[in-house]
Design a protein with these regions (language model features):
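Loop/turn-to-beta-strand initiation segments
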Residues: 27, 68-71, 90-92, 116-120, ...
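Conserved Walker A/P-loop ATP-binding site and its immediately adjacent core
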Residues: 8-47, 212-216
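Conserved helix/coil segment N-terminal to the catalytic DExD/H
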Residues: 61-92, 103-108
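Conserved RecA-like helicase motor-core motifs
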Residues: 42, 49-64, 207
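Conserved pre-motif I regulatory segment
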Residues: 1-3
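Post-DEXD/H (motif II) to motif III coupling segment of the RecA-like Helicase ATP-binding lobe
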Residues: 99-162
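Conserved interdomain hinge at the start of the Helicase C-terminal
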Residues: 18, 174-214
Length: 216
């Protein structure tokens, strides 16, 4: 299980593993959490100069499950209910963004891959719970940190960050539901004015991210 943050080259690491095991005549199952990542991984392989169309088969949204291609790129949702026999030909399994897999589904897939001697999990982060770490290490093996975000910043691969957390204090109030409390916060005039003024006072370009678009 390789823990490596954003912009650390996870796609290139995965590509290198795939090319290595394809050259060794192995059949590879590459599992990702979303449909968009299936296409992104396929495109990354093409961008690295590989003839992905000749070597890779994509599975998602009801696509054909069976293929003779040496590499299958799929979402975990597309395969976790398949019979054990479907998994028998795979010698290598690679899980990208492994922290986003549901534990039961991941275990279901990995236990069916009893012929997969080589198992690699990639993630930028763990969710902070020891149980989740144990589940991932149980199916992929021991975890190793490839690098850290601060190291990438020192090396100039990532932008230098200055993170400041601002906490706005409100008078204590009681709400019947969680949604009532959220509604109070996002419609609070002074709070929104503070965010507005802060945004306008900052130099350069500013990106403001928020949830509940309609409410704002």
């Amino acid at each position: 299980l390789l823990i490596s943050p954003t912009a650390s080259g996870k796609s290139l690491m995965i590509y290198s593993l795939v090319r290595y095991y394809v050259d060794k005549g192995q059949k590879i199952l590459l599992v990702v959490p979303t449909t968009s990542l299936v296409e992104q991984m396929y495109k990354d392989f093409e961008d690295y100069g590989w003839d992905a169309e000749s070597y890779c088969h994509k599975i998602y949204s009801g696509r054909e499950k069976d293929s003779s291609a040496p590499v299958t790129i799929t979402t975990w949702q597309s395969i976790y209910k398949l019979e054990r026999s479907w998994f028998e030909d795979y010698n290598v399994v690679i899980g990208d963004e492994a922290h986003l897999f549901k534990s039961k589904s991941l275990i279901s897939i990995m236990t069916k891959l009893h012929h997969a001697k080589y198992r690699f999990g990639f993630t930028g982060t763990l969710d902070g719970t020891q149980t989740h770490k144990w589940v991932l290490e149980g199916v992929f093996g021991p975890s190793y940190k490839v690098t850290r975000t601060d190291e990438l910043m020192k090396q100039g691969h990532l932008s230098q960050l200055d993170i400041q957390c601002l906490v706005l204090k409100h008078k204590p109030q009681t709400f019947e539901t969680y949604n009532d409390e959220i509604e109070y916060l996002i419609s609070h005039e002074q709070r929104n004015k503070f965010i507005q003024n802060l945004t306008l006072d900052l130099k350069g370009n500013t990106l403001v991210l928020f949830a509940r678009v309609e409410a704002h």
